[in-house]
UniProtKB/Swiss-Prot annotation:
This is D-methionine-binding lipoprotein MetQ. GO terms for cellular component: plasma membrane. NCBIfam families: MetQ/NlpA family lipoprotein (TIGR00363), PRK11063.1 (NF008285). A lipid is attached at residue 23 (S-diacylglycerol cysteine). SUPFAM superfamilies: Periplasmic binding protein-like II. GO terms for biological process: amino acid transport. Keywords: Amino-acid transport, Cell membrane, Lipoprotein, Membrane, Palmitate, Signal, Transport. The lineage of its organism: Bacteria, Pseudomonadati, Pseudomonadota, Gammaproteobacteria, Enterobacterales. It holds the Pfam family Lipoprotein_9.
Length: 271
């Protein structure tokens, strides 16, 4: 038994050593990078960046997909990935404040306008008093949605609320709308809910069910939106060669053309 224990211990130590060596090599490899993206349309765009990175810069990009907005920053902070490309600055700022992450933006990608969608109405004139309106529940996209609802005249918010208003900041609601906060991935499905008259949905999730702002949105965020998406890394690897190569690959004409195709003209260049 003692012999077996020593053998297992030795093997375990060897495996641990190899794992550590592998991690060290991967972190220093300027020709490999792991990037977190949201599954769906943004993943398709990132796959074009992946090809450009390989063809132009000899960089192997390993895409790691996520289904929500929370895990990509957690994985990046833990070192499970080297970068992510999915969020805008207000969301990143809120994450840094709430979770204490040491993350930093290293490049812009696109503005993906949010829009109001419905399977019940075709214009805001048809929206009935007391209707339920679904919005994302994370603080930054909730604020973004409320600001858009204000812009189209459905509600009025307190003065000076900035980019992060909540439903508590609604001071006028002439149609007595009921604001329903949902997880962002649930919003496309909410359109089939008999109780939901309208949903404000991020382009990433809307595209998963074939909707685009320009074609299907009842109202759409302006193109001068401050919510440009970012490529984000940790502070300790922001100047790494693999990061620089990936940013160059993403900010290419090929990726811009791909984004416009995937989002049917709904992607606005942010660099």
């Amino acid at each position: 038994m003692a012999f077996k224990f020593k053998t297992f211990a030795a093997v375990g130590a060897l495996i641990g050593s190899l794992a550590l060596v592998g991690c060290g090599q991967d972190e220093k490899d300027p020709n490999h990078i792991k990037v977190g993206v949201i599954v769906g349309a943004e993943q398709q765009v990132a796959e074009v960046a992946q090809k450009v990175a390989k063809d132009k810069y000899g960089l192997d990009v390993e895409l790691v997909t996520f289904n929500d907005y929370v895990l990509p920053n957690e994985a990046l902070s833990k070192g499970d990935i080297d970068a992510n490309a999915f969020q805008h600055k207000p969301y990143l700022d809120q994450q840094l404040k709430d979770r204490g992450y040491k993350l930093v933006a290293v490049g812009n990608t696109f503005v993906y306008p949010i829009a109001g969608y419905s399977k019940k109405i075709k214009s805001l004139d048809e929206l009935q008093d007391g209707s339920q309106v679904a919005v994302p529940n994370d603080p930054t996209n909730l604020g973004r949605s409320l600001l858009l609802l204000q812009k189209v005249g459905l509600i009025k918010l307190k003065d000076g609320v900035g980019l992060l208003p909540t439903v508590l900041d609604v001071v006028e609601n002439p149609k007595n709308l009921k604001i329903v906060e949902l997880e962002a991935p649930q919003l496309p499905r909410s359109l089939d809910d008999a109780q939901i008259a309208l949903a404000v949905i991020n382009t990433t999730y809307a595209s998963q069910i074939g909707l685009t702002p320009a074609k299907n949105g009842i109202f759409v965020e302006d193109k001068d939106s401050p919510y440009v998406n970012l490529i984000v890394t940790r502070e300790d690897n922001k100047d790494a060669e693999n990061v620089k190569k990936f940013v160059q690959a993403y900010q290419s004409d090929e990726v811009y053309e791909a984004a416009n195709k995937v989002f049917n003209g709904g992607a606005v260049k942010g660099w």
